[in-house]
């Protein structure tokens, strides 16, 4: 989850888990890890696992070498449903402990949102520049799809905020069970009034989602589902050749333009709209993690040495320059047997 307040980092006796200052990614230092396994029990999301071959703890690295090159993570790149988005937040790191310490668990969601700074605010931009954040990162924050979904439109929610780890992977709750139920009962499943009534009447799905995303606060989940239902009804009128009903948008505190923008991002967004990833700046190259992909170490899930004998098990440097000089290959069109240029590192010095 790459939390703002990671419990695995606090639980590690060796101090092997750290949060990168440049992008907030939580990583495990394999040299310092001594296999205490306290991070495994300390992570409430069970995102840390123990590699019995190496005797080290491992976790999702968020494909940081790819991010440094401005390329999405592998899980996002290969998602057939195009359900994943990647963007950045500008947040107030000094207030993380304060936000995670609010007494009422139901206030944790709003407390976490309060940490997210408005990238369009001139004061935030000025302070970001003073702190050495490149303008390209500020621009990326302004165009971040995750910021729009989580903070601007408030339709994405954090997973189990009651753990007080301030997770930074956000989820849009599903509307489909309610739509399917209305359709099975013979009702108009696209009508905003029918959807609003069903959301309030079906307490079990709402309460279940509230336990997942809002520490049991059903009002927040109801608000999110109503916004999604309103977008569905608003766009149906436009699709059928009519004009968007502004009353539907206004009923959930949005405008027609915002409703259409949200629809576009969630339904037909292009590649560069779903993944807004600023590249690492070369002037900060000394801070980059110039090493092999963490999934391709001995004993790792990539099993680098066993999979590619001609590589002799040597880690391949994954950096901005490597991606710049390589060709893009579509995994969907790859036959799985050939070795097209750009898919594997060039170890012979020849194309």
Language model segments and positions:
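Membrane-embedded catalytic interface detector for glycan/lipid assembly enzymes
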Residues: 58-61
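Iron-sulfur cluster-binding cysteine motifs and their immediate structural context
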Residues: 5-32, 37-55, 68-95, 146
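A short linear boundary/processing microfeature
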Residues: 49, 66, 102-106
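The substrate-binding groove and active-site-proximal loops of carbohydrate-active enzymes
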Residues: 1-2, 65
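Short acidic DE-rich linear segments
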Residues: 350-351
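Long, compositionally biased charged/polar accessory segments in the mid-to-C-terminal portions
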Residues: 81-347
């Amino acid at each position: 989850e790459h939390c703002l307040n990671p419990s695995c980092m606090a639980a590690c006796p060796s101090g092997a888990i750290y949060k990168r200052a440049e992008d907030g990614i939580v990583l495990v230092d394999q040299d310092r890890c001594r296999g205490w396994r306290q991070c495994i029990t300390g992570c409430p999301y069970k995102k840390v696992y123990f590699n019995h071959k190496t005797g080290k703890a491992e976790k999702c690295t968020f494909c940081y070498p790819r991010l440094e090159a401005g390329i999405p993570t592998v899980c996002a790149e290969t998602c057939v449903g195009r359900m994943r988005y990647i963007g950045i937040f500008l947040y107030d790191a000094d207030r993380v402990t304060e936000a995670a310490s609010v007494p009422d668990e139901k206030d944790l969601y709003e407390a976490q949102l309060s940490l997210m700074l408005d990238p369009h605010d001139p004061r935030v931009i000025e302070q970001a520049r003073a702190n050495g954040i490149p303008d390209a990162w500020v621009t990326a924050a302004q165009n971040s799809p995750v910021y729009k979904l989580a903070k601007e439109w408030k339709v994405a929610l954090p997973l189990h905020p009651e753990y007080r780890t301030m997770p930074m992977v956000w989820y849009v709750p599903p509307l489909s069970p309610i739509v399917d139920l209305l359709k099975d009962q013979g009702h108009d499943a696209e009508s905003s009034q029918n959807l609003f009534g069903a959301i309030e009447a079906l307490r079990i799905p709402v309460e279940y989602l509230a336990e997942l995303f809002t520490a049991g606060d059903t009002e927040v989940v109801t608000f999110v589902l109503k916004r999604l239902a309103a977008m569905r009804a608003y766009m149906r009128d436009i699709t059928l050749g009519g004009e968007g009903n502004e009353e539907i948008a206004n009923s959930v505190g949005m405008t027609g333009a915002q409703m259409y923008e949200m629809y576009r991002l969630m339904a037909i967004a292009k590649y560069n709209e779903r993944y807004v990833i600023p590249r690492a700046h070369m002037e900060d190259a000394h801070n980059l993690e110039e090493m092999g992909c963490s999934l391709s170490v001995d004993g790792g899930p990539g099993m680098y040495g066993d999979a590619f004998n001609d590589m002799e098990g040597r880690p391949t440097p994954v950096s901005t320059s490597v991606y710049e000089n390589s060709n893009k290959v579509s995994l969907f069109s790859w036959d799985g047997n050939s070795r097209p240029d750009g898919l594997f590192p060039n170890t012979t010095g020849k194309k």
